[in-house]
Amino acid sequence: MSQNIDKIQDHVELFHQPEYQELFENKKALQGMASDEKVAEIAEWTKTWEYREKNFAREALTINPAKACQPLGAILAAVGFEGTLPFVHGSQGCVAYFRTHFTRHFKEPFSGVSSSMTEDAAVFGGLKNMIEGLQNAYSLYQPKMIAVCTTCMAEVIGDDLGSFIGNAKADGSVPQDFPVPFAHTPSFVGSHITGYDNMMKAILLNLTDGKKPTTSNGKVNFIPGFETYVGNLRELKHLTSAMGVDATILGDNELYLDSPNDGEFKMYQGGTTLEEGADAINATKTIALQTYPTVKTLEYIEKEWQQPTATYRPWGIKGTDEFVMALSELTGNPVPPELELERGRAVDAMTDSHAWLHGKKAAIYGDPDLVMGMLQFMLEMGVEPVHVLVHNSTTEFEEEAKALLASSPYGQKATVWGGKDLWHLRSLLFTEPVDFLIGNSYGKYLWRDTKIPLIRIGYPIFDRHHLHRYSTIGYNGAINLLNWIVNGLFEEIDRNTNIPSKTDISFDLVR
């Protein structure tokens, strides 16, 4: 064996060793797999227009989805509030998946519990699990609030969360006045952004239950949406502070998802206080930074709180300008020199790199609001989007995206693909290649197959560290986006021009 105490091989090298290569060959023979030549033949066929037509004729099969299920978004909304423990009414396996999904992206512990439903609960209902689960969660983890959502199992059998929680309180599992907001989050409907919306609405409804708007507190509420860049929360606080806005961020998970290593574990870090959440009903306005994960929440605020709402996407120069000017109009404060300086730096950086991006063709996939923000920025840089794919799409998103693309000379060649998955995108990239692809870590398989460089922007990002700490919004965020894209293209140029005396005529020191 090449792996021994004197010669430790990491996993990158280990499986290239002869004994493992022999094992893999024996496995292929045992399983009766097709020959390498046949696999290569079929692989080539999947790159053709003929295969693309068959691929797009799929109706009842998803291959490599570009979305997740509702509870994932629900628990992200929950941890944005002080001392809140997400409680998933369903099996342990589901909540383990949700927690590891966030832990791998943020590189932080992510707390959450389940009602541990098994076969008996699937037949007889999960009331007993709810009663015992809430009691254990309350006594063991001492939260200030428990936010309950559901998985497929609980939804298929029709468990009534409101009734179950009421019975649990009557049974003494938690005090009667203890806040237990709940949201039904069936995974077979919508996606993670729907779950975020459902839980955010449920928490605000619970915290303001029985309250009516009184005298305005002079504050402005901000709802980040399904936000996986903690740098964006810091950037939001920076922009609102610079503009003199008395802001309440509803669902502030910045510290929870980017906590310091100070030698002491804290289960609940940061978050919007429950008092701030309850007082949000008295704000002058609520502003969302994402449209599609806040639809029901904003409808609730407008109807029940009688509070005006608005949505802004501060991506790129134009989007940030609109956001900053809206804050200026809201407060009556002028734009401070600090933000003018940041804007000038962003414009200068974009001017420096414009020649390298102008006219480049791009493909992008991700959540609706992230894709809209990136389209705004790319069009400002003269990038020409070709494939715009959103798996968790809606008719409203597709109309909005098409209108944005039609408004720019650089968006005329783009096609919006709603409800399509990453296997669809693979066909698109082979039949209509582009210069670069923007997406999350799952795009690396598209990069491997098509050799189209991947710029990692989105969620989840598992295979690169610390990108979630940066901002993508504001003037500072525009510089980050530019940095990732243009330097990603430079890396690709260097990879393609590094053979001495053959391709290195453009292996330049200065770009």
Swiss-Prot record:
Keywords: ATP-binding, Iron, Iron-sulfur, Metal-binding, Nitrogen fixation, Nucleotide-binding, Oxidoreductase
Entry's cofactor comment: Binds 1 [8Fe-7S] cluster per heterodimer.
InterPro entries listed in its UniProt record: ChlB/BchB/BchZ, Nase/OxRdtase_comp1, Nase_comp1_CS, Nase_Mo-Fe_CF_bsu, Nase_Mo-Fe_CF_bsu_N
Oxidoreductase as UniProt keyword: yes
Amino acids binding [8Fe-7S] cluster: 69, 94, 152, 187
Catalysis: reaction(s): N2 + 8 reduced [2Fe-2S]-[ferredoxin] + 16 ATP + 16 H2O = H2 + 8 oxidized [2Fe-2S]-[ferredoxin] + 2 NH4(+) + 16 ADP + 16 phosphate + 6 H(+)
Tree of life domain: Bacteria
The protein's required cofactors: [8Fe-7S] cluster
Pfam family, one: DUF3364
UniProt-recorded Gene Ontology molecular function terms: ATP binding; iron-sulfur cluster binding; metal ion binding; nitrogenase activity
This protein's GO CC annotations: molybdenum-iron nitrogenase complex
EC number: 1.18.6.1
GO terms for biological process, alphabetical: nitrogen fixation
Its job: This molybdenum-iron protein is part of the nitrogenase complex that catalyzes the key enzymatic reactions in nitrogen fixation.
Family designation: Belongs to the NifD/NifK/NifE/NifN family.
PANTHER family cross-referenced by the UniProt entry: LIGHT-INDEPENDENT PROTOCHLOROPHYLLIDE REDUCTASE SUBUNIT B (PTHR33712:SF7)
Summary of subunit composition and partner proteins: Tetramer of two alpha and two beta chains. Forms complex with the iron protein (nitrogenase component 2).
Protein name: Nitrogenase molybdenum-iron protein beta chain
Organism encoding this protein: Rippkaea orientalis (strain PCC 8801 / RF-1) (Cyanothece sp. (strain PCC 8801))
Lineage: Bacteria, Bacillati, Cyanobacteriota, Cyanophyceae, Oscillatoriophycideae
